[in-house]
Amino acid sequence: MDKIVIEGGVPLRGSVDVSGAKNAALPVIAAALLAEGEHEVRNVPDLADVRTLGKLLGHMGCEVARGEGDRRTVRLRVPAAVAPEAPYELVKTMRASVLVLGPLLARLGRARVSLPGGCAIGARPIDQHLKALTALGAEIRIEHGYVNATVPRGRLRGTVFTFDAQTVTGTENVMMAAALAEGETVLRNCAREPEVKDLGDALVAMGALVEGAGTDEIWIEGVPSLRPLSHAVIPDRIEAGTFLVAGALPGNDVTVRGCVAAHQEALVEKLRAVGAEVTKVEGGLRVVGDGRPRPVDVRTAPHPGFPTDMQAQLMVLLCLADGTSRITETVFENRFMHVQELIRLGAHVEVDGRVAMVKGVPELSGAPVMASDLRASAALVLAGLAASGTTEVLRVYHLDRGYERIEEKLAPLGARIRRVRG
């Protein structure tokens, strides 16, 4: 099993490029199921989750390949007849596999999709997906770990539906289903993340009638058919945010190229609050970590609030602050599993339910640590960069689900980091 080995305490200097957003690429690739023909999705990161979705679509009868000479382009050939099943063997490692449910129901009128897997960061049920699809006319049964869904009328029908809670994949799944439904659909209390808007843009490029994607109310007028997709996904705001936090660590000076400043407003506000210097530069943002951070209080929230996917990374910065910070996690339960590993590095963190109190220390010291989920693994890499001595991050398969060769991106900044194949 691979591990990442870091010799920490070395200042980072220079520029780093952001890959395409995994969480935008996955729904856009799934949307290809809505239309027969040859599709092209650009700026796609080469990540484990993307490869898993490609295998899943291949199982359904699609041809999926990376572009020759351009590994960031994924080309798909979707046949007229698509197998409507997503088996457990492929779905178990990636929660986003459930995104095929909406397109399959909309185009084929039936689907059999295994209940999803993914990171172990608490309950992330798909009940909102199923309630909304039922409102569109689907009949759904859960049997033997599978969602079995059919459309008795032959075609989904438009509806007005209000999500009980904001859900990114739920919003995306229902958007795709409604794109081929008969009549008008209005979705309320929708997730407002940039990735939702990106999917809306991709659907419009396919000929769908979608308005409001990226706001809390989305309007969709169903059409009989869609054309093949050609779309470039947005940059990964979480990867960008991870590098921005790296730049804010004491003594560092990092320019993150390709990030969208508008997607980073909540994070940038906190980075400036801790004392980091953040400036817009051509094509990105520059962050300078000027001295020991100041403590801040952080509360995660759905977009445009502070992203839960950046909570662990920011905690690393606050572990070095001159004072005590408070982090409140409101989005997912059980998302402080990285805390025990940070404590192994010398951090002082106490967790009470959804609240973590972080008492800053002058420095961290390297040690072997074990990743528990995707963003926790990124946080441990950041901590290793800041710590004195050697840090080994184990179970980096979590990291590979969301970061594209992170060690190869950090090394040119001066980081002493390498992957040891196991």
From Swiss-Prot:
Its EC number is 2.5.1.7. UDP-N-acetyl-alpha-D-glucosamine binds at R95, R124, P125, I126, D127, Q128, D309, V331. Keywords: Cell cycle, Cell division, Cell shape, Cell wall biogenesis/degradation, Cytoplasm, Peptidoglycan synthesis, Pyruvate, Transferase. It catalyses: phosphoenolpyruvate + UDP-N-acetyl-alpha-D-glucosamine = UDP-N-acetyl-3-O-(1-carboxyvinyl)-alpha-D-glucosamine + phosphate. The active site is at C119 (proton donor). Transmembrane segments: none annotated. One of its GO terms (molecular function) is UDP-N-acetylglucosamine 1-carboxyvinyltransferase activity. GO terms for biological process: cell division; cell wall organization; peptidoglycan biosynthetic process; regulation of cell shape; UDP-N-acetylgalactosamine biosynthetic process. The modification 2-(S-cysteinyl)pyruvic acid O-phosphothioketal is found at C119. Phosphoenolpyruvate binds at K22, N23. It is found in: Cytoplasm. SUPFAM superfamilies: EPT/RTPC-like (SSF55205). InterPro entries: Enolpyruvate_Tfrase_dom (IPR001986), Enolpyruvate_Tfrase_sf (IPR036968), MurA_subfamily (IPR050068), RNA3'P_cycl/enolpyr_Trfase_a/b (IPR013792), UDP_GlcNAc_COvinyl_MurA (IPR005750). Pathway: Cell wall biogenesis; peptidoglycan biosynthesis. Belongs to the EPSP synthase family. MurA subfamily. GO terms for cellular component: cytoplasm. It comes from Anaeromyxobacter sp. (strain K). The gene is murA. This is UDP-N-acetylglucosamine 1-carboxyvinyltransferase.
